[in-house]
């Protein structure tokens, strides 16, 4: 009986630890990695696999979700009051939309990857930066253009000069 209680308690502890809270200081990558050592290992693994700089991965997560694993875009309002549909299917640390996330899972053979898991999100960001480099010939070390391509998507990147909001966001990613 005592053994069963320990197993149940341990299981609950594991589940609760998976519900990661937002780091205290999201402005400093060293502080983030001191608080979340595994996050450093995950970003480093993504860097080794895809060549996406660690600072760029963190900048994308900061800008997209502010390190909130359950982040979603705000709902549109009907008559400025009634909550309505969300403008996109983006979710999690990377704010990846469902279609692109499914493409990532297929191409990387990661059927169990989830947008709410930091490890999978930074691997997705690394994959996206790598593909952006291959498709659009944007340097992996160019945060401005890489973020514009991430924000607008590969197809809409060519028209980014018309989107003032995208330009402002891209200037904030460093």
Model regions and ranges:
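Sec-dependent signal peptide recognition
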Residues: 3-10
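Hydrophobic h-region of N-terminal signal peptides that target proteins for export
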Residues: 13-20
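Export/targeting segments at the very N-terminus of extracytoplasmic proteins
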Residues: 20-78, 134
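Second-shell loop/turn segments in exported
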Residues: 27-33, 43-47, 83-91, 107-119, ...
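Extracellular/periplasmic catalytic domains that process cell-envelope and extracellular macromolecules
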Residues: 51-53, 86-88, 140-142
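Short, surface-exposed glycine/acidic/tryptophan-bearing loops
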Residues: 71-103, 149
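Alpha-helical segment that forms one wall of the substrate-binding/catalytic cleft
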Residues: 93-145, 149-156, 173
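Short secondary-structure subsegments characteristic of cysteine-rich extracellular domains
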Residues: 166-174
